[in-house]
Amino acid sequence: FRIASRSAKMGSATLRFGLLPDEGGQWLLVQHLGVAKATDFMMRKRIVDGETAHQLGLVHEVVDEEDLMDEAFKLARELAEGPQVAMRMLKRSILLAADLTWDQSLDEIAAKTAVTDHLPDAREGAQAFIEKRKPQFNGWLEGRSDPPMDGPAPWESASE
């Protein structure tokens, strides 16, 4: 998910300096814009504002600059409140769909559905629907301990 302010400036600056987009920018732009638009965008070294980026499909939403952080946090909360395991599996299915046939895609999502249908979040979603209330997903994740580690986490010092 990508949100931009109306005043945002976006572009690929590498060619301006005689460099190639070695971080994969060309691949990302081709995926989002198609070959012709990505070629135009990068070869002509275009810099676009938030509205134009939205029209091109580079961002999903454009908001006023003063609302950008509030909207970003609102989106983050919306995603965090969703059924995490099902969302992770759906995201993977969406990413795979471009390279699968129709039948393969149906088989792939059916395999994931066989798992998610038996998670507590599915029961909570169905119960919330029956009770006409907002579901409270991920409650079953609370209280679970992290897997054991041999020694401190990489960001902790051994003396803590």
Segment roles from a protein language model:
Residues I3-A8, V59-D107, A114-P120, Q136-S159:
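C-terminal long alpha-helix characteristic of the crotonase
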Residues E23, L33, I47, E108, ...:
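A generic structural signal for solvent-exposed, polar alpha-helical segments
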Residues F1-M87, H118-L119, R123:
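Crotonase-fold acyl-CoA enzyme core
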Residues R46, I94, R133:
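Glycine-rich beta-alpha junction loops
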Residues A126:
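Flexible, glycine/charged-enriched surface loops at secondary-structure junctions
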